[in-house]
Design a protein with these regions (language model features):
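Short proline/glycine-enriched turn/loop motifs at strand-loop junctions of beta-rich domains
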Residues: 98, 150-151, 289, 328-329, ...
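Hydrophobic beta-strand segments that make up the repeating blades of beta-propeller
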Residues: 33-37, 92-96, 144-148, 196-200, ...
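Beta-propeller blade termini
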Residues: 17-27, 77-86, 119-120, 128-138, ...
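Blade-edge motifs of beta-propeller repeat domains
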Residues: 1-15, 52-74, 105-126, 157-178, ...
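Gly/Ser/Thr/Pro-enriched helix-cap/hinge segments flanking short amphipathic alpha-helices
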Residues: 207, 221-365
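Short, solvent-exposed loop/turn segments at conserved positions within beta-propeller repeat blades
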Residues: 42-47, 96-100, 149-152, 205-210, ...
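Acidic carboxylate motifs that coordinate Ca2+ or other divalent cations, activating on Asp/Glu
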Residues: 28, 32, 87, 91, ...
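Proline- and Ser/Thr-rich low-complexity, intrinsically disordered segments
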Residues: 361-520
């Protein structure tokens, strides 16, 4: 690597800092960076926080003052980009230590920000160490958990969905009075609810070991869990990160401790619950898809994730997004809203897989139909997944081409590399055939022309045309003699049925005359 700090536009000053957070605040496809400084105005050469806009050419521009996010000279431990009001623009939360309140900068969408901490209800003053963002109640609005020192305890902020937050630390049972540092959201048991892990250590000069905390989300509240292994050992924990070291779909935890306790990797023993792992790859948006909103729907349940970079205290989570699915066996839909404004939607996904979703994949990798798209019951249709290395259709077929004989939704995973890519599912509908009821009146006499035929289509689609083999057209015929009449009935969906109608007639009447001679 070559150090390009001085030439790429990043300001070269002496400062103290504990975090950088990355986000595309102007949604131009290039990640910008916010540098947090832990300096107050009483320190020599005190610096504010810095926002550097990525110019897309390998250089950055200092837009701190233009954007209005300097935060003054305050003791900032951490900052995080996330969209708290669901307007698609990444906002900025700044967690400040000691006597400095926390700040929430609302993204105005024009390169500037408005500070709304007081109005949003998050401008409290306490020893904010770190902030982690997640949607713990699956309502589609992202909440915050901020760690603190023992005096006031940690803060859980519930997003009310109207631009404000409510402190629910006590009511959610996540309030704890220890020296807390890093915290992460993770669905440790894959039950569809995100749990909470908090790293703890006593503060200098004591540096007493603390017991890390794990709060299991029950769906209605949180309960401290003491049987996970994580919470049975005294640690000197500062930071934690989430990942999946053995790719089993259960999130593992890496904990960074102060010496003499070393770094610890805690492997999740897992279970039988199902899961989905998703990683994003931007094409128009930034490569990692940072700033994307993902919504998973299954059996009427919804889960939401927001992709971030640098949201943890002295750590970074894996870019894999985890969705626990308990005993559900199919995902109804997965929606990715990218920073570019593009939306990918995938339907009817199987569970227990790791997917790399490429921006635009749901429309680029279309399933092609071979032959006519006007299909009726009794016909067949061939679907083409395109040229890839491997295939897995929703039917279980592993061939490129799939022949279908009945209505349904068909999707396929295709792979041209390490991970599978999903195609847009296709709905196939076989139109029902016409159902013809035949009403007849047979000729009343031999060789008479008073026969009658009426065809009544009681099928789903109306009749468009009836053609008889003798050239007549229409559903009603009269003035018919006995015989066999063949027709083709076609409905408005293009489906047809061909049958024949037989009209019988009475036998001819024969008369015989007998003469008897009369003898006189």
């Amino acid at each position: 690597f070559t150090d390009v700090s001085a030439t790429c536009g990043i300001i070269q000053v002496s400062t103290i800092g504990y975090s950088t957070s990355w986000g595309d605040y102007n949604k131009d496809g290039f990640l910008d960076v916010y540098l947090s400084t832990y300096m107050d105005s009483f320190q020599v050469n005190a610096q504010t926080n810095f926002l550097f806009k990525n110019n897309g050419d390998g250089t950055f521009e200092n837009t701190t003052d233009i954007a209005g996010v300097s935060n003054g000279s305050q003791l900032t431990f951490e900052s995080v980009w996330f969209d708290y009001d669901n307007d698609t623009w990444p906002d900025l939360f700044v967690a400040n230590d000691r006597s400095f309140r926390n700040f929430l900068y609302h993204n105005n969408g024009d390169g500037t920000f408005s500070e709304v901490g007081y109005a949003a209800g998050v401008a409290q003053v306490f020893d904010a160490m770190s902030v982690t963002v997640g949607d713990y109640d699956n309502d589609g609005w992202f909440d915050m958990y901020i760690t603190n020192t023992p005096e006031l305890g940690n803060y859980m902020y519930h997003n009310n969905g109207d631009g404000t937050f409510s402190v629910v630390s006590a009511s959610s049972n996540t309030q704890m009075f220890q020296y807390s540092w890093g915290a992460i959201w993770m669905d440790g048991d894959n039950d569809q609810w995100q749990d909470l892990f908090v790293a703890t250590i006593d503060f200098a000069p004591n540096n007493f070991p603390g017991i890390d905390s794990y709060f299991r989300n029950t769906g209605t509240s949180f309960e401290p869990t003491y049987t996970t292994g994580l919470t049975t050992i005294a640690n000197l924990s500062y930071a934690a990160a989430r990942g999946d070291v053995n790719n089993d779909g259960y999130a593992d935890i890496l904990i960074h401790n102060k010496q003499p306790i070393g770094t610890q990797l805690w492997k999740n023993e897992g279970g039988s619950a199902n899961y989905l792992k998703v990683r994003l790859q931007g094409t128009i948006s930034n490569r990692e898809g940072v700033g994307s909103r993902i919504e998973l729907s299954a059996a009427g349940n919804h889960q939401y994730r927001y992709t971030m970079s640098g949201e943890q205290y002295l750590s970074q989570n894996s870019q894999w997004q985890f969705f626990g699915l308990s005993d559900l066996t199919q995902i109804d839909s997965l929606v990715v809203n990218w920073p570019s404004g593009y939306q990918d939607v995938f339907y009817n996904l199987p569970v227990n897989q790791s997917l790399v979703l490429v921006e635009g994949a749901s429309s680029i990798n279309q399933i092609q139909i071979i032959g006519s798209t006007h299909i009726c019951e009794g016909d067949s249709l061939v679907l083409d997944a395109g040229a890839w290395n491997s295939y897995l259709w929703s039917t279980g077929s592993t061939d490129r081409y799939l022949t279908v004989y009945q209505s349904g939704t068909y999707s396929v995973e295709v792979s041209g590399g390490e991970f599978p890519v999903l195609t847009q599912p296709i709905d196939v509908t076989f139109s029902p055939l016409p159902i013809v009821e035949i009403e007849t009146i047979e000729p009343p006499c031999y060789e008479s022309n008073h026969g009658f035929i009426q065809l009544v289509n009681s099928g789903v689609n109306e009749t468009s045309q009836v053609i008889w083999t003798d050239g007549f057209e229409g559903e009603i015929r009269d003035g018919l003699t006995a015989g066999e009449y063949e027709y083709l009935l076609m409905d408005v969906a293009g489906c047809s049925i061909s049958q024949s109608v037989i009209l019988d007639q009475p036998d001819s009447i024969r008369t015989y005359a007998e003469f008897n001679q009369i003898t006189c």
